[in-house]
Amino acid sequence: MTGPYFPQTIPFLPSYIPQDVDMTAVKAEVAALGVSAPPAATPGLLEVVQHARDEGIDLKIVLLDHNPPNDTPLRDIATVVGADYSDATVLVLSPNYVGSYSTQYPRVTLEAGEDHSKTGNPVQSAQNFVHELSTPEFPWSALTIVLLIGVLAAAVGARLMQLRGRRSATSTDAAPGAGDDLNQGV
């Protein structure tokens, strides 16, 4: 499985690219403009690519004018295009599906961007995708560490209070109670 249409990063997974998608033409348009799209949508998508570049994102966009049977081919197209650009993020849009590829962003970020990119309007979809990529992520690791430290501190505090309560109960029971027990027995 080698050749110009198969990326070398995942050689054991077959790609599914619809027969009606001319990957040679798509790759040539992306190389020339950064966008492969029908002429009506190209100017708006070029603006999005420029905005992404201003945000520090090397974005390539492929727009299909029809839907494939499912979204898998879009990710495969993005992977094939992305194989030529090691630092680029590739977004592939169809009327109802979205696919993406990037070596710069984690899959969870790409999936979040894809979720916001299913608008039916390619320019708005691409803008939403760029916005999601440029939005800082919530620091989940820091929150997890703070919560773990808080739970540990609460557990240690509860144990110390338990030991202090047991110690004070033992000392108050032993001192006054020792003489009373002897007097009651006589």
Curated annotation (Swiss-Prot):
The chain crosses the membrane at residues 138-158. It comes from the Bacteria. GO terms for cellular component: plasma membrane. Coiled coil: none annotated. The keyword Membrane applies. InterPro entries: Rv1476-like. It is found in: Membrane. Residues 166-186 are annotated as: Disordered. This is Membrane protein Rv1476.
